[in-house]
Structure formats: structure tokens, C-alpha cells
Amino acid sequence: VRDAYIAKPHNCVYECARNEYCNNLCTKNGAKSGYCQWSGKYGNGCWCIELPDNVPIRVPGKCH
């Protein structure tokens, strides 16, 4: 498990405005919790706590 930005296909973050949206998204994917990281490295994106290793995360490089 790891703490990371959960990624959509093609290495894009889930953009967000509310913590509730990210918490639901992250826990649905097996994480302990999640919140909306505002003005982070990739803009406003969902950050998950203890996300399982099989779930894709945002990595350096382009979002297509």
C-alpha cells in the first residue's frame, strides 16, 4: 500500500473540489481514506491514504 494521487487511465489525476468526493473514491478503491489536495503538484487532485498497490497512481510524465 502507499499514499498517492489515484490515477485515471492515461496517468491523469481525479480532479476535485471536495474532500468527500475523494474520500468516497479512495475508499471504494480499497484505501483507508482520501482527501482533495488543493494546489498540489498536479493541481487539485484526489490524494489517497494507504491505497492498495494494484490501483493505478499518478506518476511523473504526461497526462494524455
Swiss-Prot record:
Disulfides per UniProt: C12-C63, C16-C36, C22-C46, C26-C48
Tissue distribution: Expressed by the venom gland.
Keywords from the UniProt entry: Disulfide bond, Ion channel impairing toxin, Neurotoxin, Secreted, Toxin, Voltage-gated sodium channel impairing toxin
Keyword Disulfide bond annotated: yes
Record domain LCN-type CS-alpha/beta: where: 2-64
A Pfam match: Toxin_3
Primary site of residence: secreted
InterPro entries the record matches: LCN-type_CS_alpha_beta_dom, Scorpion_toxin-like, Scorpion_toxin-like_sf, Scorpion_toxinL, Scorpion_toxinL/defensin
This protein's name: Alpha-like toxin BmK M2
Top-level taxonomy: Eukaryota, Metazoa, Ecdysozoa, Arthropoda, Chelicerata
